[in-house]
Amino acid sequence: MKALTVRQQEVFDLIRDHISQTGMPPTRAEIAQRLGFRSPNAAEEHLKALARKGVIEIVSGASRGIRLLQEEEEGLPLVGRVAAGEPLLAQQHIEGHYQVDPSLFKPNADFLLRVSGMSMKDIGIMDGDLLAVHKTQDVRNGQVVVARIDDEVTVKRLKKQGNKVELLPENSEFKPIVVDLRQQNFTIEGLAVGVIRNGDWL
């Protein structure tokens, strides 16, 4: 896939979100309205550019004739480096798809996250490994989670008490991360459900 411009990414994300929420793609007029274009024709130009880059297909003769091609890729999406403040599964973070059966993991894995660093090495999560993640916010103390603190994404063991969260490493060379929920933005992105040693499934 060719890289998208910022504007093209906005159009693509809007189409994908609209399909996810309503079950159908938006019209050109809806795209123009949502993104502040002067006319549906401007939206049409962006759609043509997306079609040339191979991420959508335009079905002629239908006001909602847009089909996402990216969504047809099978396997689990692999998330690489996550830019500050952006959704974990934003299209630009997905490096590719791995042909891994999600049901190999309990609960099922929704995506893979490329591990950066050695803070969890004592439980076998190494730098460059692919962490299988179940997307949920329903987690318990003691579980290994993917968490976002302000704009940073990290993998740690969870310990929550009142307004304080400790994210514990599994490596004595690293210190716990302490989060004050009254002052910092904290989100659970998912639960770690398994590890694929990088290269094993390529």
Swiss-Prot record:
Keyword terms, alphabetized: Autocatalytic cleavage, DNA damage, DNA repair, DNA replication, DNA-binding, Hydrolase, Repressor, SOS response, Transcription, Transcription regulation
Pfam families given in the database record: LexA_DNA_bind, Peptidase_S24
Catalytic reaction equation(s): Hydrolysis of Ala-|-Gly bond in repressor LexA
The keyword Transcription regulation is assigned to this record: yes
Record-level Gene Ontology MF annotations: DNA binding; serine-type endopeptidase activity
EC code: 3.4.21.88
CDD domains: S24_LexA-like
Keyword Transmembrane helix: no
GO BP annotations, alphabetical order: DNA repair; DNA replication; negative regulation of DNA-templated transcription; proteolysis; SOS response
Active site residues of this protein: S119, K156
Residues of the DNA-binding region: 28-48
Site (Cleavage): A84, G85
Similarity-based family: Belongs to the peptidase S24 family.
Described purpose of this protein according to its UniProt entry: Represses a number of genes involved in the response to DNA damage (SOS response), including recA and lexA. Binds to the 16 bp palindromic sequence 5'-CTGTATATATATACAG-3'. In the presence of single-stranded DNA, RecA interacts with LexA causing an autocatalytic cleavage which disrupts the DNA-binding part of LexA, leading to derepression of the SOS regulon and eventually DNA repair.
Self-association and partners: Homodimer.
Protein name per UniProt: LexA repressor
Biological source species: Escherichia fergusonii (strain ATCC 35469 / DSM 13698 / CCUG 18766 / IAM 14443 / JCM 21226 / LMG 7866 / NBRC 102419 / NCTC 12128 / CDC 0568-73)
Name of encoding gene: lexA
